[in-house]
């Protein structure tokens, strides 16, 4: 179940094709409920239309992010069969590639394919996560909130248009101050596989310095250096004689909309890997507080598996 608002401001949203955005609720099942629970989720989403506004069958890309709850976590005594999730709550990420067929002036028939992922980023172990691919079919109802304010009653004198007549996407624009040096600091906490089901935890630290270049108002790239501290390595990589820090390099792509930025870094290590894979990824969500500072939540990975969740702040000390 989802509730959405239609964007209209040409200056802010026109360049993104006038997306809709909102909140939703999810309830589902994952095999044996005594092992995995019956997951429910609360999430936010944004729907980016791709098709020409004149087409009756519209294609859109819709990412969503939220929290899943009502899970049954791993317990060595009471729930040893659950080797996927070690916490009662997890992050819920979903990516939907969908179509909407304009059935009536108020109703759409929606259908698509989606990918969903539940994970807690090794904040608790085990954390193999849960991945789900599926198809979806639904109905979408459009209504105009001004109708009840302007023309009240069961038989209004005039019926306002329910469906928003979306305009063509406005051209991308180059932005001023399109280059910067960014400094990002983040903390995290992890469990090891040996510590699953216990209160034993280890702290992590990330320091990132990169060069950031914006091509247009939507797209940018970055490249830079990473410094990591993972205190769990003292337990998981005994050959390192207590070493717990790594240095790496990365390159990345950003997609920017409103004050939010979706970030994807890919990198490798310049120093000894200390038992980690050859490469790491960093998918993240960034909120721009102002031109000089931002808050960011991301996931640092080991290859394609979660390493730890980063909670941090960033600064742009140099912009030009």
Model-derived regions: residue spans:
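Residues that define the transmembrane beta-barrel architecture of outer-membrane proteins
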Residues: 1, 17, 36-42, 57, ...
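Residues on the lipid-exposed face of transmembrane beta-strands in outer-membrane beta-barrel proteins
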Residues: 1-5, 44-50, 63-67, 95-101, ...
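Transmembrane beta-strands of outer-membrane beta-barrel pores
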Residues: 5, 25-31, 65-73, 115-121, ...
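Repeated loop/turn-to-beta-strand initiation elements of outer-membrane beta-barrel proteins
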Residues: 9-12, 59, 101-109, 145-149, ...
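Transmembrane beta-strands of outer-membrane beta-barrel proteins
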Residues: 19-23, 59-65, 109-113, 135-137, ...
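Solvent-exposed loop/turn segments connecting transmembrane beta-strands
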Residues: 29-39, 55, 122-127, 195-202, ...
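Outer-membrane beta-barrel "beta-signal"
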Residues: 131-157, 306-320
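Detector for outer-membrane/organellar transmembrane beta-barrel domains
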Residues: 176-265
């Amino acid at each position: 179940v989802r509730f959405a608002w239609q964007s209209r401001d040409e200056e802010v949203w026109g360049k993104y094709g006038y997306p809709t955005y909102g909140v939703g609720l999810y309830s589902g099942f994952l095999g044996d409920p005594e092992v995995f629970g019956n997951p429910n989720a609360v999430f936010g989403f944004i729907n980016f239309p791709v098709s020409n506004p004149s087409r009756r069958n519209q294609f859109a890309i819709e990412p969503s992010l939220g929290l899943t709850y009502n899970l049954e976590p791993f317990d060595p005594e009471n729930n040893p069969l659950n080797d996927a999730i070690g916490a009662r709550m997890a992050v819920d990420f979903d990516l939907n590639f969908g179509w909407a067929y304009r059935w009536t002036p108020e109703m759409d028939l929606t259908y698509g394919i989606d990918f969903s992922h539940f994970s807690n980023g090794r904040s608790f172990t085990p954390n193999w996560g849960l991945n789900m691919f599926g198809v979806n079919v639904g109905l979408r109802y459009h209504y105009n909130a001004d109708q009840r304010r302007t023309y009240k009653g069961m038989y209004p004198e005039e019926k306002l248009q329910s469906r928003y007549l979306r305009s063509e996407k406005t051209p991308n624009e180059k932005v001023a101050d399109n280059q910067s040096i960014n400094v990002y600091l983040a903390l995290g906490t992890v469990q090891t596989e040996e510590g699953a089901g216990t209160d034993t935890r280890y702290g992590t630290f990330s320091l990132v310095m990169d060069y950031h270049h914006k091509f247009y108002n939507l797209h940018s790239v970055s490249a830079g250096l990473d410094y990591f501290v993972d205190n769990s390595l003292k337990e998981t990589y005994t050959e390192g004689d207590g070493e717990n820090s790594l240095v790496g390099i990365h390159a990345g792509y950003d997609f920017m909309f409103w004050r939010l930025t979706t970030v994807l870094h890919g990198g490798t290590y310049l120093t000894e890997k200390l038992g980690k894979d050859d490469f790491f990824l960093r998918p993240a969500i960034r909120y721009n507080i102002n031109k000089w500072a931002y808050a960011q939540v991301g996931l640092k990975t080991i290859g394609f598996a979660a390493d730890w969740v980063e909670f941090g702040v960033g600064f742009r000390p140099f912009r030009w």
